[in-house]
């Protein structure tokens, strides 16, 4: 039952998260020489109403920001017909970058992994993504962030000459969540 309800919440949360207006990366260009992460956490009540949206980044520790989110009528209808009014669903959409070697791709303890995608990136000397390949997937759903979106990212340019071989990094996209009951 939990998985089915969470799956419905996820379908709704995905549309909600897409509508969330969050700050993008805190830097104009992302760092390809050090690991970092960014995440958006959306809390949805049992009636399908978004209760909160929070953006956090390791690039600016301790500077979490609120984000605006709207639920579509369809998302609200799905959740209100399948969830208890005293229940909340918390869904987190996270991306992690690891230079060189593939990093941790697990959901935090206590959360259920709903979707995962790991991409190997080749980052050129000018900071553009020159190559992308999905190297691992997991969970029941596929995150809406793939090679097309990763290829649009801008990383800091390399200090090396423009003939240097591309730097390798791994972008991990995770969707995970859990339900909470109000007592």
Identify the role of each PLM range.
Residues 2, 19-183:
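Charge-biased low-complexity segments
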Residues 12-18:
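N-terminal signal peptide c-region/cleavage motif recognized by signal peptidases
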Residues 1-9:
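Sec-dependent signal peptide recognition
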Residues 8-12, 81:
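Generic detector of low-complexity/intrinsically disordered segments
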